[in-house]
Amino acid sequence: MLLVIGLGNPGKEYQYTRHNVGFIAIEKIANQYNSSFSTKKKFNCEIAETISDRQKIIFIKPTTYMNLSGKSVISVKTYYNIYPAKIFVIHDDIDLETGRIKFKTGGGNGGHNGLKSIDGVIGNNYNRIRIGVGRPQNNQDVADYVLNHFSKPEYKTVMQAIDRITSNFGLILENKLEEFKN
């Protein structure tokens, strides 16, 4: 069983912001598996489930705001008894250029409040799929930057990255994490 978490903020006003690339990506991946989201209040998230290659995949989008994402993650992880090695968090990363993808297991949270929240409840030994959204320019506040919408060229670049993640997601199911990293 895999738990795949897309980080973002709920609400239409945040739908296409940099901070919501995790939501955008997970919706596309779940759609690839013909799985649609429904709200589960007891888990504080939207959840979609599917079975692929005899393996159950649970996709979640926390309905808490980013800073409280751990609340959703711990409730789903506990209910389904999922080990951290089988948890994959998809999130924005300002330390990567727009559209760049990096995969890592464990490590620090890089100041990302969603990851801080998750680390606080399950530790940090889970997998992360980081999608670059670039850095703010001209002393722009980081919070303002990640809560703003992409420019059209940035959005196109990010969607190409999400397409690559989606088309290679099967490697995760096959436990070919080294291949997925590349």
From Swiss-Prot:
Q: Highest taxon of the source?
A: Bacteria
Swiss-Prot/TrEMBL site (Stabilizes the basic form of H active site to accept a proton) positions: D92
According to its UniProt entry, the protein's GO biological process terms are: protein quality control for misfolded or incompletely synthesized proteins; rescue of stalled ribosome
Q: Where does tRNA bind?
A: Y14, Y65, N67, N113
EC supergroup of this enzyme: hydrolase
Describe the reaction catalysed, as an equation: an N-acyl-L-alpha-aminoacyl-tRNA + H2O = an N-acyl-L-amino acid + a tRNA + H(+)
tRNA-binding among keywords: yes
Q: Where in the cell is it found?
A: Cytoplasm
Q: What is its EC number?
A: 3.1.1.29
Do you know which InterPro entries this protein is assigned to? Pept_tRNA_hydro, Pept_tRNA_hydro_CS, Pept_tRNA_hydro_sf
Q: Which UniProt keywords apply?
A: Cytoplasm, Hydrolase, RNA-binding, tRNA-binding
Matches recorded under SUPFAM superfamilies: Peptidyl-tRNA hydrolase-like
Question: Single GO molecular-function term?
Answer: peptidyl-tRNA hydrolase activity
Catalytic residues as annotated in Swiss-Prot or TrEMBL: H19 (proton acceptor)
Query: Cellular component terms, GO, for this chain's entry?
Result: cytoplasm
Annotated disulfide bonds: none
> PROSITE patterns, alphabetically?
PEPT_TRNA_HYDROL_1 (PS01195), PEPT_TRNA_HYDROL_2 (PS01196)
Q: Where is this site: Discriminates between blocked and unblocked aminoacyl-tRNA?
A: N9
What quaternary structure, including any partners, is listed in this protein's UniProt entry?
Monomer.
Matching entries from NCBIfam families are given as: pth
PANTHER family tied to this protein: PEPTIDYL-TRNA HYDROLASE
Similarity annotation: Belongs to the PTH family.
Known function = Hydrolyzes ribosome-free peptidyl-tRNAs (with 1 or more amino acids incorporated), which drop off the ribosome during protein synthesis, or as a result of ribosome stalling.
Name the UniProt record assigns to this protein: Peptidyl-tRNA hydrolase
> What species is this protein from?
Rickettsia peacockii (strain Rustic)
